[in-house]
From Swiss-Prot:
<keyword id="KW-0689">Ribosomal protein</keyword>
<dbReference type="GO" id="GO:0019843">
    <property type="term" value="F:rRNA binding"/>
</dbReference>
<comment type="subunit">
    <text>Part of the 50S ribosomal subunit.</text>
</comment>
<comment type="similarity">
    <text>Belongs to the universal ribosomal protein uL22 family.</text>
</comment>
<dbReference type="GO" id="GO:0003735">
    <property type="term" value="F:structural constituent of ribosome"/>
</dbReference>
<keyword id="KW-0687">Ribonucleoprotein</keyword>
<dbReference type="InterPro" id="IPR047867">
    <property type="entry name" value="Ribosomal_uL22_bac/org-type"/>
</dbReference>
<dbReference type="InterPro" id="IPR001063">
    <property type="entry name" value="Ribosomal_uL22"/>
</dbReference>
<protein>
    <recommendedName>
        <fullName>Large ribosomal subunit protein uL22</fullName>
    </recommendedName>
</protein>
<dbReference type="InterPro" id="IPR036394">
    <property type="entry name" value="Ribosomal_uL22_sf"/>
</dbReference>
<keyword id="KW-0694">RNA-binding</keyword>
<comment type="function">
    <text>This protein binds specifically to 23S rRNA; its binding is stimulated by other ribosomal proteins, e.g. L4, L17, and L20. It is important during the early stages of 50S assembly. It makes multiple contacts with different domains of the 23S rRNA in the assembled 50S subunit and ribosome.</text>
</comment>
<comment type="function">
    <text>The globular domain of the protein is located near the polypeptide exit tunnel on the outside of the subunit, while an extended beta-hairpin is found that lines the wall of the exit tunnel in the center of the 70S ribosome.</text>
</comment>
<dbReference type="InterPro" id="IPR018260">
    <property type="entry name" value="Ribosomal_uL22_CS"/>
</dbReference>
<dbReference type="GO" id="GO:0022625">
    <property type="term" value="C:cytosolic large ribosomal subunit"/>
</dbReference>
<dbReference type="Pfam" id="PF00237">
    <property type="entry name" value="Ribosomal_L22"/>
</dbReference>
<dbReference type="InterPro" id="IPR005727">
    <property type="entry name" value="Ribosomal_uL22_bac/chlpt-type"/>
</dbReference>
Amino acid sequence: MATNTNVSRVQEDGRKVKRSVYHRMRKEKEASEPIVEARAVTKYVRISPRKARSMANSIRNKDISEALQILTFSPKKSARILYKTLMSAIANAENNFGLNAENLYVSEIMVNEGPRLKRLWPRSHGRADILQKRMSHIYITVRDKSADK
């Protein structure tokens, strides 16, 4: 029987740390580091991920002001949805973590596929096709520019 030893849970003197103590120590270490990013998630949006990704690629790694300008003047449906999610991420950064909105940029943006609604579409001669209405999950992370330097 093989033993599974986690090297990071062993102290300098060779003693193993209890799991609860290890997790508390890890949380304290993470809490001491300054938070430089904020996230916003929008799930089950009724838009095809393929169509939403084209707009998401245009604002990736852009400054917040530039990304908002691109989304504001775009006529696409995905731009309106991404605008709301980006505004939520900015609000999370300002209100929850005290970050300045002028120093933020879009560090990460993902559009994943959600569940599909399947509907029947009547066709000729008594047949039917399946119409798939796709959904998307959108994840946006904004980071502080000064923290990356």
